[in-house]
């Protein structure tokens, strides 16, 4: 089991390639069978083995073991199987030790170990040992590195997001760790030079936008749907419009500014434009649409003017490609819906002119 964990971990000191595929597949299937049938004595023996190999700085002499350890945790503690308090404490020390290495691979490996701990440990153990705070403070330092790969960026922010569930005194009204993350994410998106990284960061901004909602799982499912289908977009739009977006109130102006700054990337390739625009659409649905216009109207005229102009420029640059035209039309429909949905209230005077303008654009695009 220990050997298979080292061989199948990626990357490892053995550089075990993914071909022939039958070999790696057989190894993984065998490993899954033996890890799920582990009993107490086997677990104790494995724990003792890793304790000897990965104690303090000794992990640097056992590179295979440290990669194998992360693989073992992922396979051994899955589903309803939770880590013991002893394994939780040991995994924390291993994660902290490997992250002292300057190599980004080991910082990412440490974040992976932390994420496995946060997902597969007893919440009571995590909170009593204050594990989540230690991990958050350690990993948040990586959030300032804007040159990471998409994989490393995803590992960092996934780990930080998992920490939030264990802060029992956190609420949506007071400034909290969620706000610190949004501050850094918005900053990183604005200075990101790669579309793929921007898309990755935007997804986490969107997730934080509905973190405090009671129907978080429902919103997760709706946002994961294919929103190019009108009926699914309608369900998603209605659900997002009813969100209680107290956190987004504080960030609405900066999120709108971020979307305008990012819109320049929409003029790149058709594929990049489509993916980024769809992610912007989800972000707008969650973070901006639920906010009452009376609280938002001071920021919207500038956003409408600049952002819609870029959307129209996209159509010209990409020669009205259907994969670009569809999300552009959807965005314009959402902006129009936002204005029309305030019909029960008096529409702010500085927004009244945009209602007819957006309707005209929608009709023009439909031709």
Model-derived features: where do they sit?
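Alpha-solenoid helical repeat scaffolds
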Residues: 37, 75-79, 119-123, 162-169, ...
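Eukaryote-specific, cytoplasm-facing alpha-helical/coiled-coil scaffolding segments in long proteins
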Residues: 28, 96, 117-124, 140, ...
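Helix-rich alpha-solenoid scaffolding regions
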Residues: 2-26, 34, 99, 103-169
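Short coil/turn segments at helix-helix junctions and helix-capping linkers
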Residues: 14-22, 52-63, 94-109, 140-155, ...
């Amino acid at each position: 089991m220990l050997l298979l964990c080292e061989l199948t971990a990626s990357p490892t000191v053995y550089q075990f390639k993914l071909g022939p595929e039958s070999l790696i597949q057989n190894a993984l299937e065998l490993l899954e069978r033996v890890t799920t049938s582990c009993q107490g004595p086997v677990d104790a023996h494995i724990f003792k083995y890793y304790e000897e190999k990965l104690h303090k700085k000794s992990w640097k002499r056992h590179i295979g073991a440290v990669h194998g350890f992360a693989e073992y945790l992922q396979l051994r503690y899955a589903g309803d199987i939770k880590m013991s308090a002893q394994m939780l404490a040991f995994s924390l020390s291993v994660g902290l030790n490997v992250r002292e290495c300057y190599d980004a691979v080991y910082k990412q490996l440490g974040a992976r170990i932390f994420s496995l701990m946060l997902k597969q440990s007893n919440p009571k153990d995590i909170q009593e040992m204050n594990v989540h705070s230690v991990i958050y403070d350690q990993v948040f330092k990586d959030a300032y590195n804007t040159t990471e790969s998409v994989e490393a960026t995803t590992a960092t922010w996934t780990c930080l997001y998992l920490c939030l569930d264990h802060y029992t005194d956190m609420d949506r009204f007071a400034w909290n760790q969620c706000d610190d993350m949004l501050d850094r994410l918005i900053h990183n998106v604005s200075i990101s030079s790669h579309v793929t990284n921007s898309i990755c960061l935007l997804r986490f901004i969107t997730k934080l936008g509905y973190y405090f909602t009671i129907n978080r799982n429902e919103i997760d499912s709706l946002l994961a749907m294919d929103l190019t289908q009108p009926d699914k977009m309608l369900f998603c739009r209605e659900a997002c419009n009813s969100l209680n977006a107290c956190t987004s109130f504080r960030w609405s102006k900066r999120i709108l500014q971020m979307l305008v700054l990012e819109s320049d990337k929409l003029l790149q390739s058709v594929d990049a434009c489509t993916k980024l625009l769809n992610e912007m659409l989800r972000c707008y649905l969650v973070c901006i649409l639920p906010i009452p216009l009376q609280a938002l109207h001071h920021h919207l005229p500038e956003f409408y003017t600049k952002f819609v102009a870029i959307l129209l420029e996209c159509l010209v640059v990409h020669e009205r490609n259907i994969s670009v035209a569809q999300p552009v039309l959807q965005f314009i429909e959402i902006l129009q819906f936002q204005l029309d949905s305030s019909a029960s209230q008096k529409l702010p005077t500085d927004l009244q002119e945009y209602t007819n303008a957006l309707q005209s654009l929608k009709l023009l695009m439909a031709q």
